[in-house]
UniProtKB/Swiss-Prot annotation:
It catalyses: RNA(n) + a ribonucleoside 5'-triphosphate = RNA(n+1) + diphosphate. It holds the Pfam family RNA_pol_Rpb6. GO terms for cellular component: DNA-directed RNA polymerase complex. The gene is rpoZ. Its EC number is 2.7.7.6. This is DNA-directed RNA polymerase subunit omega. HAMAP family: RNApol_bact_RpoZ. The lineage of its organism: Bacteria, Pseudomonadati, Pseudomonadota, Betaproteobacteria, Burkholderiales. One of its GO terms (molecular function) is DNA binding. Disulfide bonds: none annotated.
């Protein structure tokens, strides 16, 4: 199993606070039943981080949040 690191995710989203928010929102979507964008048998949080590190998910997660 490959390990995911925060540094891999920070290459995609340089601001660690925005990274945390994007990962949280995506993990919540996955936990509610949305389909993952990559094959993963990990928990929603790890899957969200893997998606961010691979560039499949990014700051668009922050634009989807209602204000």
């Amino acid at each position: 199993m490959a390990r995911i690191t925060v540094e891999d995710c920070l290459n995609q989203i340089p601001n660690r606070f925005k990274l945390t928010l994007a990962a949280t929102y995506r993990a919540r979507e996955l936990a509610q039943g949305h389909a993952p964008r990559l094959d993963s048998k990990d928990k929603p949080t790890v899957t969200a981080l893997r998606e961010i590190a691979s560039g499949l998910t990014g700051l668009e997660m922050l634009r989807k949040v209602p204000t």
